[in-house]
Structure formats: C-alpha cells, structure tokens
C-alpha cells in the first residue's frame, strides 16, 4: 500500500472515531495493521475480554513472529489460566492449558511442566513464584504493565503506537477543499451551491439544464474568479497548503537511468503516486509497513534537501533502533515539541578510562542499554563493556568455530597465520544479535542474552580476503546481515539461518563500507569502495542504481542522522586529506562540506552522528564536533590527551556518552551532564531496577530462550518482579558460573600510592557485616554460594540440609540485592519441608559435600555422601535422585552449553559425565589417584579442569573427554600431604587462568598446559587455607583460614592487600573455636563476600562506606610480595 493510501486509512480512522463508530474503528485498526490503539488494548485487558484481546493482537503479530510476541501471548494466556484456577474452574483451566498454553512447551518444556503442576495444588499461590499473586484486578494491572513494555520493545509494533498529529476533522476539511476547488471550475458558479452527493464531482447546472463536464476530464484552467464557497461539512481548521511532492532519495543519484520513467504531474490534492523516479522500481510490499517507516505529517521540503519529518514524541534516536519508549496517543491532534541543543550537550568530559589490552578497531553502543559498549580489536578480540561500572561483561578471542567447513583459501591463510583483526563490530537493531567482521574471510554472528551470556549463532565464510564492513538491515521485516569485502562484492545474508540472499557485483575496487537504509517504500544499500566510488543497490538483481564519486575520491563511510532524513559521509583520500559532507539525496550532489578537518590525516578518519543535531569525528589527536547546520567547526577536545591521530569513536543513541580509543590500547568514555549523572548513579549502584545494568537485572526463576536469537526476552511463571528491562531477561540453558556478570574495574590514580601499607581490620567499625538470621538447627556450613541474580545466598550444612536466604526489594534495598545493611528472610516453603540430601551411615570426615547451582537459579544439584539430588529452588521439591553410592559424588559442575549434562567427581577418583535427561553416564574419565574435589569448565578453551585429594590437576577436552594435561601441585616443605585435603579450582573470568585452592597455598595456573604462574604460601601463624574464591571481577581473591581470619589478595600478583581479623566479625567470646569453612563472592559486587562458619552461621561482609574497598594493591616496586617457603625445588616466588 502506498504511503498516501496509508494516510487515507488514518484519516478514515479519525473520521470513524469522531463519528463514534467505535467497533468499526478498532476493526479497521486491526485489519489495516497501521495503528495499535494502546488505550483500547488496555481497556480490553483490564476487563478480561481475552478473545477480543487476542483477535486485536492478531492484526499486528502472531505467536511465533518473535520472542516479544511470544511472551505477549504467553502472559495473556497464563493470566487466563490462573484466573480459571482461582475460580476453581479446573475444566476451563485444563482447556486453556491444552489448547492455548501447550504451544509454548516446544520452546520451554520445563516451564510448561511447572504450569501443569499448578493443577495439583489446592491454591496455586503455594507455588513460590506466584505467592505474590493478589486478586484478579491487581494481577491484570501488573500483567498490563509488562505487556506494554513488551509491545513498545517489539519491532513489529514500531511506528504503530503513534497516531499522526492531525487537525480535527481532517477528512472533512479535505472534502471541503475539493468541493471548493470543483466549484471554482464551474462555468456558471452559483453563489450558494447545494451539495446533495459526494459520489460524483460537483457542477453548477447551466440555466438551460446542461452540465459541465467533470473537472477530472479537463486540464486545469488558468485564473478563476473567486466565488462564494460551500458551507463546511464539519468543523475544521483553516485551509491547508498543499504539500510538496515527495522526492525520492535515489532519484537524483541516477545520471543515466536504464529505465525511462514517465513524468508525473503533481496535482493540487496530492493523492496520486509521488513524483518519484524510483516508483517504477518498487517491489511488492507486505501489508505491514517497514519497521523504520515513521508515520508523520508531511511538511513542505526546502529547495535543497529531501523531505524532512519530525520524529514522533517518545521515539528514541538512532537509525534502525527499536523504540523502547513510544508513548501511545489518542486520535485528536498533538503538537510535537522540537528539542533544542547547546554545546553543553556535547559529551566532552572524561568520565571513565577502560583498559582493553590491544588496539581498538571498532566500537558500537547497545541500542537499548545505553551504557553497554561492544569493542573489537586488532588482535581479533571482542568485548562487551558495561562502562558505568567499568565491567568487562564478555570477552572472546578470534577462533574459527568450524574450520572444516571453511574454504580452502581460508584454511590456507589460517595455516600460515592463525590471527585476524576485527574490522567492524555492530549490534542488531534490538541488541539481541551482534556481528563481527574479521580481516580474514569470516563473519561471526553472536546472540546476546544479557550479562555474560554470549552464544555462537552463525559463522559465515563471507568474502575472499578482508571483510571490511558489516551492517544489519530489515528489508520487508526480514532481519539480514549486509557485508562487503576485499573481493569487491556486497552480500546479503539471512541473520537467522545464514543463507545468502543476494550478491551485488559492480565495484572495481575492494568495497570499504556499506550503509543500508530505507526511505518511504524504498529499501536500499549504499556502498563505497576504496577508490572513492559510491553505488546504491536495491534488494534485487538489477545492478547498481548509482555510480558516483566521493569527495576527493576518498575511502569513505556513510551514515544517516538519527531520524534517517539527512545523509552524511566522511572519508580520507590517499594523500591524507579528509572530508565530511552532507549529501543532497534528491540531486546526488554534495550539499554542505564541513570545515576543520586536517589535511594530512593518518589513516581513515572515523565519524558518527549525534541525535539529529551534531557530527563528531576523530582527527588530529582530538575529538571534533560540528553543528549539522553549520560548516564551521563547533568545538573540539583532546580528552585530556593520549588519543591517536585518527581515533576510533562512537556515540550512544541518546548522545550522552562518547567512546574514543587511546594510544595505550584503552578507551576513554566522554560524557555530558546527563551522561555523567548516569555513570555516577551506576557506579554507586543507586539505581532502580529499570536502569540496572545488564547482568544485575533480577532474573526470573524459570526463563525460556524462545524464538529466533535476535532478541533476549524470556518467559517466566513469576508474578512479583516484573520491573526489569524487557530486553535483558536471561535464558535457561547454558548454565555456567565461571563467567560472572562483571569485569575488572580500572583503579583510580589515588590508589596508586607510593607509600603502601597492608590494611589490617581488627574492629567491627572498620567493616560492615551481617550475620544472617537463622531459626533452624545450627550445623557447620560446608558449602556456600550466591544465586546468580545476587539476591539470595544458599548454604549447605554438614547435616545435609540446605538453607536459603532471600533479600526483598524495599526502599532501603531498591534492587533486592544481597547486602549487609538489610537483613534477608530465611526462606522456607509453606509445607515446611527443607531441601535435604540423602546421606549414608559412616565417618563424617569421609563425606565431601558438594553442590552446583543452575544459572537461572531454579535448580540446585547437591550431594552429601548419598545419592545426588536435584532440587527445585522455587518449591524446595526433590525433582529426582540418582547415582546411589558407592562411589559417592564429591564434586559437581554443570556443563556450560547444556545444563542437562553435569560433570561429577567421585570418591573413587573418577569423573563421570552424566546426562540427566536420559539418565545415562556418557563418559567416565580416569586420571586421578584419589577422590576428585574440584571441577571447573572453560568455555573459551573448551576444557574441563579437575583437582583431587591427590594434589593433582588434570585438563580434559570437552570434545572427546580425552586428558590433555596433568600437573602435580607443589606442596611446600613443612606441609605433610593430607589425604582428606579438598583441593578446589575456579577459572578466572578470562577462562584461561585457574585459581587452585589448597590447604597449604593459593596458586594460579594457566590452562590448558597448566603452567604455574603464581604461588602464595601463607604464614604459619595464619593457619591453613579453608577456602578461597575470586571476586566477581576476578581482581581480588578472598581466602578464609582456620584461625578465623580472611585475607584479601590482588589476583594478578597474589599479593596480600587486606587482612580481616576474626575479632572484627566473629562473636567476642565463642563457646568453641569458630572459623570460616567456606567463602563465596557476590556475583556483581566485587567488594562483597560471604563466609559460612563452623558454628552454622553465615556472615555477609563489606568494606565501610558505599565506595569502600579492601585496601590498596601493593605497587610492584614496593616488593611486598607473598610469603613463600624456602624449600628447595618449590615454586617460591610469584612469577
């Protein structure tokens, strides 16, 4: 449907609404699919008119369109189901379950089983997730809030939530204007004409009764005397000027079109086809409009530029970005305020410095999470940073996923040098996917599910040689990946399947960049080559529509401003001269050339657009800014120095933060006032859940990974906590605790003190501590862990019972995270049944308790010398038990790619790879001599590391479970081997370095060869190490001792920086010797940890003050290293 036909539908909708044809209005909204009436939808949901709700939705989306749609339908049907259960109408509930909810079982079988189990409960509120379910009215209100977020984030609803700004009775106005115009054409106009029909054109009859031919069959006349007009058909505003005909963005870029296009005369009404040379090239379109075609009023175009439109209020800036805050409007007209900007809005203040470790080649801010930055480097590494908290959430090195399927040329290239640089990184429009273009043939597409959850999605052997650029596009609402490369081609790939859809050939030099875009009904791709040629392509096989030269025949990239109405390019010629220009798309000519770039640039200058107002470029060791409407340089900043000649840079969608590369392989984050406020708030963790960083969002207990991977929305059974961002819900599978949700913080300069001193804490006033409330039988805590959400702590006691403490959201604890200020609740089900492991008679000292928590916090696998038990963390129910001893389980770990597979260390020295789903041991690994006491997976290296009571480390390949390496831990002199010693292992967040915890020492080994990198042997006065763990950012190590003390070490050097004495947190006069038997680190707060005591108590410990830290790391030149033994032949000094 053409744009004007679409607007006619809006006029009809307005007319029907004004005439009170309510049912017809909503039916037309649904059948056209042009406008989603949020108010009507809210009313229908509130009234519980579920059939009407689903019928209305069906005009805009289907259940399986994408994850957002799936979750919308799931929430509605789940509410229907719960209401039927609440009314004790089990027959209806079963009908809803079978006919409406069963469709979701394909995507999350466990969730469907959980929902089915509700039928067995007397009151479904007995289920912990539904314990907060109130009455029907409040439940619908909570659900409605969730649905609105999902609809606003769903790309299928883009531009359908905003009704155009129209004057009242606009259709009547147009009819009156038409009648007045027809009356002016009458040969004998009457002063007061009588209108009896609109079905035929109006004419005033001749005195003799003859009629004038219809004006549609006559040419327009010249000047006609003004005569009295018709009385208006209804209230309307003053006469509207006829809008200028739309000029297409590609028309002027065709100096030699291959098709002859007829001239279209624009009539005064403008309801005909637009005057467009590209109208002949239009392809048949689906009923729904493209996702980035905005519905707005036309304005008269100026003489130099293409037609400009204001953005509807509430749609966030950014080309091809999902509108996450679109506000529903009603039919009456609404004026749009145009934002004003000043130089104070420019992000120029250095607020963060991040250390990446290698030269930055490309960056891109997340389209929804405004403080999340994707980075690619010259060594092939990619990383996702949460810049607010200075946390590196994810890191990946270059690795071909499936070399066997690659071309012979690529295999040969990798054989000579297995490295590749990143040329481009970019997020998909909704942030659910990210793409990486490498300097060797390859494109990687990952699916991102929040926090550290990054999964391989597609590996494409895309081009011969360099893949120079990559972009996402959505032709006809199909998510695609557009690539270009050294082989002079542009290719389009299906982002879901990886199938190649188009190959565009025509450039005579390597293609440097691509810029997909959409104007009106035209979807196209601009491409630029290193010889300065610019071409444009439609998604067909008709060849290039444009052949033009960039200024200076420069190596150029192109970009649109945020609302897609203005086109800019930036490039650097072979001689080093750089150009930033604005293009007049209607003529294919440069409209404006900006001044202030250097004449001898080193490398290609990179640029970006900021909202719809500013341009920014990295040039001459500076960041330079221009107002889009002025050619003169507006402002510049050196960002406190340290920038390369032509730095890489990127601005976030809101224009509040700017990332720029530095010469020392780092990134500086520049901010304006609003950006500084956001960063400061996140640093203090004083955020509500709607602004919480990814990975710290409260994750639903039962979450599914549904639909295609271009979104990260999951489904949950729970009712109580729905305030987190829709796009950050994490999936169920891929359980793995080895990659925590935060990454290293950058130390402040103030911390680099030259006069270093060990921080000794001996009084309660020097820290914050909280002993968790406990009314159950006290028993020694043997295992302790935080839930992945950070809102609860799970302990396993010596008596085989589990205890779970949960922190609730409150005014004192906005995020509901574990802390030492607010006491948690000891969680117990209404049945009073605890999660208790199976046990066996025998010596307690022979038992090695162990447990592992699934990543979504829904399940815990646990053993205490007897069978292994799988518990549901929501209900405390025992899901299953298996593997009765002997042998007994002594260590457990979930497989990182499949939470149905677990590695089980046994007391007979074997390791069993067990598939829970089929109840089968897949492999049995033998390499240890004594019981296995530690297991840790590395996703990066694709290995499993094990440790045992034999003080031996082993590395096993996850592909075939062969042993790759083994190493004996070096026991210092004076320490006799303890046959009951529990050696534990934990991977650093880089997934390469392994922390080895032994009663005699801490050590860092590098996998997979198990090279001993560092060793720390505590002083004898400290006693033996009982447990140790990395902090969540892997910058510190918390080590507990049997003298009651806790030592905090710098992870990179194993140097002691803080020691917490037992008197600062333990009871002053204990009746017996009490010390921490186990320690756990908070998953997102680097300075918080918890200890489980031998008296059954659990303490949460934090430094004093909101910004407190555990001492200062010793500078290398200070020489304050770890205490080591002097035994010959031992690995004594840190290396």
From Swiss-Prot:
GO terms for cellular component: nucleus. One of its GO terms (biological process) is negative regulation of transcription by RNA polymerase II. The lineage of its organism: Eukaryota, Viridiplantae, Streptophyta, Embryophyta, Tracheophyta. This is Topless-related protein 4. Residues 290-303 have a biased composition (Polar residues). It holds the Pfam family TPR1-like_2nd. GO terms for molecular function: transcription corepressor activity. The modification Phosphoserine is found at residue 214.
